[in-house]
Amino acid sequence: MQRFLFIIRDDLTKLEKMTNQERYSRCVEEQLAWIKSLADAGLHLQGEPLAIKGRLVRKDQVIADGPFIDAKEGIAGFDVILAENLDQAAEIALTCPLVRNEISIIEVRPIDGLIQLNQALNEVKK
């Protein structure tokens, strides 16, 4: 099994329009149940929601406040899951209530451990 990072990106305009507290609460409950089902299956390793605002630090030490992707989109959180391959990880992401309810999109990235990084560097050196 490999580790995969789910970068959860929210459409901030949709969140602003979600004034129905009952619908919001239902979405949160569905998300928590989804995470629990993954954890019970041994597939969910870690995850956290993120604040909308943050700081971007560059080499020249210029610090900017954000969100940084787009004015309409922000990174809402992340999850680390286990899957056999990228296809299976993407299939798991499709089951996320935030995706099904068209609140979020999930970017799925394999997490390359240091072993894989060292192997890749050795290949480049050849």
Where are these regions (language model features)?
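Conserved, structured core segments of small domains
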Residues: 1-126
